[in-house]
Design a protein with these regions (language model features):
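Structural scaffold elements adjacent to functional motifs in cytosolic proteins
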Residues: 59-61
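Short, surface-exposed ligand- or partner-binding patches at beta-edge/loop junctions that are enriched
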Residues: 99-101
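Short, glycine/acidic-enriched loop or turn micro-motifs at the edges of active sites
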Residues: 64
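Rhodanese-like catalytic fold shared by cysteine-dependent sulfurtransferases
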Residues: 2-8, 18-45, 50, 69-96, ...
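A general structural motif
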Residues: 55-57, 94
Length: 144
């Protein structure tokens, strides 16, 4: 009988806690080896064409500030991934967004977060691929 009471108590406690976990989808920590499913990648060549054509877009580096200050794609502003929800609230929903990070997992996740927030044009471009194609980077300078 005691075993049954303990089992039912544990079951009830699990049900009581479950809704609080279900309300917030996990975003962090991000698996640094996987891209977000469904995020659209922009090639470095496509990004260069956007820059050369004077296309209106916002390039957002989602790396931590220390990494951004060491190296980023020219013209990027810094909104670290951990602050992306708040940062997106300050940007008009019709803005074309291109996210960047070192290898892609953070920026692809940011693109999906922006899409879920109502932005319709979101892509990402890894900084490593940008550099592999011979493009220059710069130190981020307090742009956020």
């Amino acid at each position: 009988m005691k075993l049954l009471i303990v089992a039912l108590s544990l079951f009830a406690a699990t049900l009581w806690c479950a809704p609080s976990f279900a309300q917030q989808p996990p975003r962090f920590p991000i698996d640094q080896n996987k891209l977000a499913v469904g995020a659209k990648e922009k090639t470095p060549e496509e990004l260069k064409q956007m820059m050369a054509n004077g296309s209106k877009f916002m390039l957002i580096d989602v790396n931590p500030r220390a990494q951004f200050e060491k190296e980023t794609i020219p013209g990027a502003v810094n909104i670290p991934l951990e602050e992306i929800d708040e940062g997106l609230k300050k940007i008009p929903k019709d803005t074309v967004l291109v996210f960047a990070c070192n290898r892609g997992p953070r920026s692809s996740q940011a693109a999906k977060i922006a899409e879920a927030a109502g932005f319709t044009s979101t892509t990402f471009c890894p900084i490593m691929k940008w550099k592999e194609e011979g493009n220059k980077t710069e130190a981020g300078k307090g742009k956020s």
